[in-house]
Regions:
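Leloir-type glycosyltransferase catalytic cores
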Residues: 82-122, 216-270
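A short, gly/pro- and small-residue-rich
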Residues: 54-83, 146-147, 201-215
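N-terminal pre-catalytic "stem/leader" segment of glycosyltransferase-like enzymes
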Residues: 1-48, 52, 132-133, 259-270
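Conserved catalytic-core segment of nucleotide-activated headgroup transferases in glycan assembly
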Residues: 119-169
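Short, well-ordered secondary-structure micro-motifs within conserved domains or adaptor modules
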Residues: 37-64, 68-72, 185-192
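Short loop/turn segments at strand-loop or loop-helix junctions that form parts
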Residues: 3-9, 72-76, 121-133, 163-166, ...
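Short acidic, S/G/P-rich loop/turn micro-motifs used as interaction or catalytic elements
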Residues: 8-13, 54-57, 131-135, 167-168, ...
Length: 270
C-alpha cells in the first residue's frame, strides 16, 4: 500500500486533486491510492509517495515517524521538451547510494545523452535553486546567494555569472543548461540542484554546496570553494559510470505503471 501526499488546493466540490504520475507509480507497486495531507491516521507500515519539494512538512513528518517515503521529481538527465524521465528515491530526494563500478550502460544509452570533454573557460556560473527549494532547508535564497558569491570572490578574480532559475519553457527552448555552460564557463557552483549532473555531462567541474549526502553528483563534485581556481574534474569514464548508475534511478511513467520502477527501487541488483 502507499499513501499519496496531496495538497488539494481548491479541487472541484466533492473531488480530490489527483496526480497521474504518482498514481501510476502506486499502481505499479500494487498499492492502494489514498489521499491525505497528514500521516497521523495512516499505519506506520504504509509508505508515503511524495512528488515535489513543496511537500517538506510531510517529508519531515515521515522522518520523525520513521516512515518510508518515496520521492518523485524531474529526472537527472535525458529529458527534452517533455519530461520523459522522473527520478524516484526512497527516503531521500536524490540518489546518493552505492555507485557500482561496472554498472550496465543500457539505460544510459537509451537516453541518447552524449558526454562532452572537459573544456577550459574563464567565468564561474552560479546556478541557485528557487526559493521554493530553499524553503525546504529553511534558507533564504538571496542570503545564500550573497554569502556564496562573496566566498567565491575571496578565492578568485574570475567573473561570476548568476543564472537564476527561469521557467521551464525558457530552460528547455531558449536558454538551456548546455547553452549556458558553453559561454566560456570555468565551472559551476550550485546548492543542491540536479544541474550539477548536467555540468558534468557538458564537461565542466561542479561545486555542490548543499548538505553532505543529498546531491546525486556529489561523488564527482567539489565542495570547498577555496579550490575554485583549480577544481577537481573527473574523467569521462567516471562521469559515464555515474550516469549509468543514475539511469537506473529514473523512470518513465510506463515503467512506473508496469511495476519496473518499484522492483528496481526495492531490489537494486543488476
Amino acid at each position: 500500500m502507499a499513501l499519496i501526499d496531496a495538497d488539494p488546493e481548491n479541487p472541484p466540490e466533492g473531488q480530490v486533486k489527483m496526480d497521474p504520475i504518482v498514481d501510476n507509480f502506486i499502481i505499479g507497486a500494487d498499492g492502494v491510492i489514498g489521499m491525505s495531507k497528514d500521516t497521523g491516521n495512516i499505519p506506520l507500515e504504509v509508505p508515503a509517495v511524495i512528488r515535489g519539494i513543496a511537500k517538506r512538512k510531510v517529508i519531515q513528518r515521515c522522518k520523525e515517524e520513521g516512515r518510508d517515503w518515496y520521492y518523485i521529481d524531474t529526472g537527472y538527465f535525458g529529458n527534452g521538451k517533455t519530461k520523459l524521465y522522473h527520478r524516484i528515491t526512497r527516503n531521500n530526494m536524490q540518489y546518493t547510494g552505492k555507485i557500482h563500478e561496472n554498472c550496465p550502460d543500457d539505460r544510459f544509452v537509451q537516453t541518447g545523452v552524449t558526454l562532452t570533454k572537459y573544456r577550459p573557460g574563464d567565468c564561474i556560473l552560479v546556478c541557485p535553486p528557487s526559493q521554493k527549494a530553499m524553503n525546504y532547508w529553511g534558507l533564504d535564497l538571496q542570503e545564500w546567494l550573497k554569502i556564496t558569491v562573496d566566498d567565491i570572490k575571496k578565492h578568485t578574480d574570475r567573473p561570476v555569472v548568476i543564472r537564476e532559475k527561469a521557467g521551464r519553457d525558457v530552460r528547455v527552448n531558449h536558454d538551456t543548461m548546455e547553452m549556458a555552460l558553453n559561454r566560456n564557463v570555468h565551472c559551476m557552483v550550485t546548492f543542491n540542484s540536479i544541474a550539477a549532473v548536467e555540468s558534468l555531462i557538458y564537461g565542466k567541474p561542479v561545486f555542490t554546496m548543499g548538505p553532505t549526502g543529498t546531491n546525486a553528483a556529489e561523488p564527482l563534485s567539489n565542495t570547498d570553494l577555496a579550490n575554485i581556481d583549480n577544481p577537481f574534474m573527473p574523467s569521462m569514464d567516471e562521469v559515464r559510470n555515474l550516469l549509468c548508475n543514475l539511469a537506473y534511478q529514473q523512470f518513465t511513467v510506463h515503467e512506473m505503471r508496469s511495476g519496473y520502477a518499484w522492483e528496481r527501487l526495492n531490489n537494486n541488483v543488476f
